[in-house]
C-alpha cells in the first residue's frame, strides 16, 4: 500500500503529469477513430464468417467456430475498453474524482487482462485443432460439433477470466497508468506484483510459442503430403491451405503485437534495482514505454479480422491462380490408410 494521505483506494500511484501534457497525449479523436475502425473491421469479419459457416465441411466449420470466437473477443474488447478510454480522453476527468473506490479501475484491469490473453489462448487452441486434424486425423472424432467447439472457446474465456480475477483475490494489483486514462497490472517489486506480471507474460508467451511450434509442424506435414501423394489419392485441399494461411497470419499478428509488451512486463518486474520506487513511482521513460507497447498490442484487435478477410480462398486465388486450377488434394488419410494396411 502506497501512502497517499487520503481515503483514495489502492489503485492510485503518485503521478506527476499536468493537464496540458494529458491533452497532448490523450487525443479523443485518435482513440475514437481507432475504436470505430476496429469495431467496423470485426463486424465485417463476423458478417463474412456468418456466410462462410453455411454449407462448409465439418472440419472447416469447427475451425470457423474458433475463428468466430476470436473475432467476437476482439470486438467486445474494443467495445468495452474503448468506451472507457474514449470517455476519459474526451472529458479528461480525474480518475480519483470519479472512481475513488477503484471499482472502475479494477473492472478495466480485469477486462484488459481477459481481452489480452483470450486471443493468444484461442490462437494456441486453433493451432492445436489444426495440428491434430492434419497429423492425427484418426485420433479425434471425425465430426467436431459446433457445441463442442463453442464449449472449448468457453473454457478459454474462463481461463483468461480466472487469471484476470487474481488481483481481486490478492495476487497482484491493478493501478491507474500513465497518462491516467487506463488501468493495468502493476509493474512493482512486491512479490504479488512480480508473480502476477510473470504469470501473465509467461502464459501469453507460451501461447505464442506453442502456436508457432504446432503451426510449423502442420505446414511441414502439409508440404510433405502434397509432394508425396499421387493425384489419384487426393481430395480438395483448398480449405486446408486457407485455414493454415489464416492461422499463420493470426500467429504472426499476435507475435508482432503482443511479444514486445509481454517481454517488457517480464523485464520490468524482474529489474534490479526495481523499476518502481517504494512510493509507487515509475520513471517517465518506463511509463511511456508501457503506453507505447500497449498501443502496439491493441492493433491485434484490428488486424485479426483482416487476416481472415484477406486470407480467404477467393482472395488467395487472385494472388495465386493455381489454387483454382490445381487437382484435388491434400488429405493425410490415404497415406495413413496405406500405412495401416502395411502393418
Swiss-Prot record:
GO terms for molecular function: thromboxane receptor activity. SUPFAM superfamilies: Family A G protein-coupled receptor-like. The gene is TBXA2R. Residues 53-66, 129-149, 220-246, 312-343 are cytoplasmic. Belongs to the G-protein coupled receptor 1 family. InterPro entries: GPCR_Rhodpsn, GPCR_Rhodpsn_7TM, Prostanoid_rcpt, Thbox_rcpt. It comes from Chlorocebus aethiops (Green monkey). Interacts with RPGRIP1L. Interacts with RACK1; the interaction regulates TBXA2R cell surface expression. It is a multi-pass membrane protein. Coiled coil: none annotated. Residues 1-29, 88-106, 173-193, 271-289 are extracellular. It is found in: Cell membrane. GO terms for cellular component: plasma membrane. PROSITE patterns: G_PROTEIN_RECEP_F1_1 (PS00237), G_PROTEIN_RECEP_F1_2 (PS50262). This is Thromboxane A2 receptor. Glycans are attached at residues 4, 16. Disulfide bonds join 105-183. The modification Phosphoserine is found at residues 329, 331.
